[in-house]
């Protein structure tokens, strides 16, 4: 019985250590896509783009930031035109970002411009 318990402990410990190593080899991508209400002027859109870009300098949990405008010839973007990608080291960092005062201030800048918003998070290997 003691050997069985010891074996189970070693097996669980090994699995836990490997899971932690795998998490350290990954980065969390947080993708936000916006579509705009008809008639939204470029000044309002530029204000959102600028405010989103400033978050990287205000919230140190953000490891990388990039953005772009849709140029896919497939016409499958469903009205979403602007795509922003933030990179985090962990889900905990992403979660802290979501409640960060600077992120909340950014969300206030959004109103009332976007018509559509989609958010997708996923893990990638480093």
Whereabouts are the PLM-identified features?
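Alpha-helix boundary/capping residues
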Residues: 11, 52, 69, 101, ...
């Amino acid at each position: 019985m003691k050997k069985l318990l010891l074996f189970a402990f070693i097996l669980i410990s090994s699995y836990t250590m490997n899971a932690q190593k795998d998490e350290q080899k990954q980065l969390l991508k947080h993708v936000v896509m916006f579509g705009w209400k008809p008639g939204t002027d470029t000044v309002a859109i530029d204000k959102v783009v600028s405010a989103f870009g400033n978050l990287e300098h205000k919230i140190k949990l953000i490891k990388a930031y990039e953005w772009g405008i849709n140029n896919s010839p497939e016409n499958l973007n469903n009205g979403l035109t602007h795509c922003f990608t933030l990179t985090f080291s962990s889900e905990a960092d992403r979660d802290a970002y979501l409640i960060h005062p600077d992120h909340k201030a950014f969300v206030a800048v959004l109103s009332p411009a976007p018509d559509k918003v989609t958010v997708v998070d996923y893990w990638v290997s480093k």
